[in-house]
């Protein structure tokens, strides 16, 4: 039993609370948890951030501080924020402090581990490189992902980051068979709800046949959830949504990462874990809010002076060891579509592959709106992907680059003023651009088109046929939202 040390609140400024500890041998340590109860009797967890004076600590709250008052008792728990572990966490939904929020009962008796942990030691890190195929043409061809790597999805508001991350969950988590952890950081509660329902429908989270049947009929009766079946689920959720205070949004990434680390390290042979973060910018944004509230001098564009170190501390824990791997896919919001903003720019340096979503491509109706010229991968070389794949990817990039250079001339003088050779380049580049689009399973309700997963060999074959001029006689419209090149050919034979 932990001997709780009692203090009292002496100041409340929004989510920042100062607590006085009198007549104690030592103050709670940095990152230690304190608890206080609001007028409704709900527990609120505070995390120590600063020692100010001899007897006072400054804390950030993990929940809304409405109803708290000066003079109220606060108790030190003697531990940091921690997450439950064990097979009981499979399929469950947690908040930042490890409490369940899915209505399926608490896990009070489970063993817990701290969310503040050191990265694995250098000698335990793995150096193996394997390609993680996603079934999405533009990703697999021009910016292949690395199993056990860190991947960033960059884009402004409304260009498709969340839809792409949901499709990646659908494609990889289903076909891959490993365990997944999803951290919802400062995003819409509705999206978290939609994702949970999608996971239940697809069988990644197992609520049992009885619940599933009711769900199909529009009901949500959690009393019908099969707890034994739930333990066989392949995904776990941790949410700190946009309506929550900055303390929760700043720590929820670490809470989710702690579960991913547990899955990776908890078995003798280890496991390969998928760790999805939506959205890593909100982690930075919450840190900026807290920094201002704690009185630190802001740096460039108002961000916290500790931006690089906070990001580095978190990203260094997302790594692969000889025991297992964590493949991290992170959505990154780009403020005002400015890639030079300090928040996305700081994230760039930690990533193995970047997928940049473009508003310009989105406006053309090409989805996913990935910009193949701005997107990168450190394994796009013959050494890792082979000669055929590399040459095809380079040819695709070259023709799109040339098309981009010609667009100014086309806008001013018109396409008729181009040389015959450049006209051919433009026509083929437009076909390539449209063939990079693809119908998604998670977007089927919007497009009315069944989602497609495309093998890398079929992808290379299709683009080579376009680049070699074998399909010049097929109109551009037939290349849009198709999977394989055979679908394009079949579509061209039908009357529009």
From Swiss-Prot:
Pfam families: ATP-synt_ab, ATP-synt_ab_N, ATP-synt_VA_C. Gene3D superfamilies: 2.40.10.170, Bovine Mitochondrial F1-atpase, Atp Synthase Beta Chain, Chain D, domain 3, P-loop containing nucleotide triphosphate hydrolases. The keyword Ion transport applies. SUPFAM superfamilies: C-terminal domain of alpha and beta subunits of F1 ATP synthase, N-terminal domain of alpha and beta subunits of F1 ATP synthase, P-loop containing nucleoside triphosphate hydrolases. It catalyses: ATP + H2O + 4 H(+)(in) = ADP + phosphate + 5 H(+)(out). Produces ATP from ADP in the presence of a proton gradient across the membrane. The catalytic sites are hosted primarily by the beta subunits. Its EC number is 7.1.2.2. It is found in: Cell membrane. It is a peripheral membrane protein. This is ATP synthase subunit beta. The keyword Nucleotide-binding applies.
